[in-house]
């Protein structure tokens, strides 16, 4: 089971792909209008390994939320508690470079509490397409296999990849 903010983009606008394609249960958690998730609400939704319930394995957070930068201290605290409860923590950071510019925090500071982070190169950076999954080697290896199984590969994409590299090297501050 995945715990996720009820109004987060991944929960609302991705056609429940995790459930449909991955067989993963989704447990939406209420968030404030600014996207903040209450720690107690998150803790109360974590299920133990009981045959009556889906086992909670992942907390998915989002920064930014509807253009609003989430307080880093809140995200870090949610991740810390989730890790203590043996959950992995993923950050949907599609527009994380916007949070980087707004807060002045380094990308390392914005991401160090998470096991994996997804970043979009076309949202705010000007690349025509492309996303990054940032994680340890074990997670990346699993992601490569899943991408292959789902047909998510492209061939001869050097030109497109070079646009993403250019965006990372030149467009963050703009």
Question: Where are the model-predicted features located?
Answer:
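Conserved PLP-enzyme active-site core in the AAT-like
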Residues: 1-174
